[in-house]
Amino acid sequence: MLKTLKQMSIPFSGNEYEIENLSKLDDKMLAAMKVSLPNQTALYDAIKGDLNKDGIEDVVVVAQETFNEKFMPFSDGCDESTKDDKWCQIVNKNRRGVVVLLSNGDKYEAAVTKRDIFESPNEDGGAYFPPELAVEIKNSELKFFYSYGKYGYWEYVFALYGKDFKLVRYFSSDNNGPMLEYIVQMDFINHRLDKSANLLYQGNEEYKRYEECIEKYRSFDDAQEEDDYDAIFIRKTYELKTQKILLSEVKKVDYIDGRWLDDLQNSKQLGKILKIDFWSEYLGDNEDELVRCVAGKI
């Protein structure tokens, strides 16, 4: 099939795993994809799965444009003296796009085409590597997953909505190494937003608000090292007023401009608090005392 890509003058990139995925595209898929993207586009990855529940595999193609002006050094601050440095190699920084091809009888049709919804895979992560994107089809849902190593991960989940795709769930986990700080879950079907804050993480607002209770809890066992405490979360459930977010209308799903959905946490789209509760994987007697103390101060 890679031979077919070359015969159709369709460039491709990606690593060995992604190129193997591209090799599984058939002629019908390639023909539908080619009319949806400009000529200056290389295929980057392909994911198969049944999105419209007709029993036939659909395909999501990740592509990357190849405009010359976006070929530049990997890092900023490179010059003639550093051109041979591995961080100054010329890479493709064109943004990546996605084409969702749905089966329709004996052919495929592009349901949604977004030419630049993702950042390039060659962004400079500074002192840490940049988040890594994975696209997945599971249970007829389209998922965009970002892994950021010790800093956490986040995921957007879309489902077919007419001829478009609607955001149905969002999940993010903010970590500081092994310590969880925040977990955010958005349910756009039931219009709920859950935000869990780790009461034992000193950097967040909930710790500062209930510091007296937390320090009392920690004094129960002076022999236990501070870093050994399990996470204990206070979870606040809000009404989420947002009606629908369509994939065709989303401009960017990446990390360069921040996790754009996190803005909903501090916007007018949030309604009243519906519930406050606590959870932990290992909630023991001392943790119960902490929960009672915090609950008494809410």
PLM feature spans:
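Acidic, small-residue rich beta-repeat scaffolds with periodic aromatic anchors
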Residues: M1-G14, G125-I298
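Short beta-turn/strand-loop junction motif enriched in small, turn-promoting residues
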Residues: K48, E65-N68
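Blade-edge motifs of beta-propeller repeat domains
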Residues: M1-N39, D106-F129, L246, D262, ...
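Primarily EF-hand calcium-binding motifs
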Residues: T41-A46
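A short catalytic or substrate-binding loop motif that flags glycine-/basic-rich loops and adjacent residues
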Residues: N39-Q40, K53, V91-N92, G149
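Residue-level detector of high-confidence beta-strand sites
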Residues: V62, A111-T113, Y170
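Beta-propeller blade repeat segments, especially FG-GAP/WD-type strand-to-loop junctions
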Residues: L2-T4, M8-P11, N68-R115, F158-Y161
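Acidic/hydrophobic-patterned starts of short beta strands in beta-sheet-rich repeat architectures
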Residues: L51-Q64, E136-Y146
